[in-house]
Amino acid sequence: MTKRFKLEAVIIFVLLFISSSSAQSSSDVCYNPNLIKDTTKKSIKSATFAMIGKDSIKINYHSPGVRKRIIWGGLVPFDEVWVTGAHDATSLELPRSISINKTKITAGKYALFTIPGETEWIVIINKKWNQHLASEYDEKEDVVRVKVKPLQVNHIERLQYYIETSDQRSGKIAVVWEKLRIEVPFEY
């Protein structure tokens, strides 16, 4: 009888352990479910991609956190070129040509910059993708510039990119951080 009691006690302990470890409070939610809880103060290297036909469009970036800082007009100044991430310029890899604002962008790798404004942003696709921050940015290398209006959203702690596509041969590149979202429509 003691062996059976010990076995039942072990089973109950294991079940309790499993059920308590799978329950998450809101403070335990991960930025990426494949990573441990996000407690880092660093800008995490991140990527996003989406399929356009049989090919994938990809964005590589570093994802800074808000961390109780003033972002717009503070950490990220208004009316200045920004890498729209951290560290290296955000890169956009296109397996095929797309059009943004009726400007054809051929297949290749590009940098994605923005100029945040209080009511309007400028999104820039630039030929020189391999650069640190915006210190090497050269307007002469711009492929296209698009004016967009920022949208208000719920708080997002870490900067995130999204690529949304549709069956209509169109899509959007979106950047979300703090309480703002910008979207750039494209066609392929």
Predicted features along the sequence, with ranges:
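Bacterial Sec-dependent N-terminal signal peptides
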Residues: 1-27
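Short, surface-exposed loop and linker segments with low hydrophobicity and enrichment for Pro/Ser/Thr
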Residues: 6, 106-108, 113-116, 161-169
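Residue-level signal for beta-strand positions within conserved beta-sheet cores that form or flank
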Residues: 19, 119, 142
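Primarily secretory-pathway and cell-envelope proteins
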Residues: 24-75, 80, 134-188
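Mid-length scaffold segments of soluble, non-membrane domains
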Residues: 81-131
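Alpha-helical interaction segments
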Residues: 7, 72, 99-101
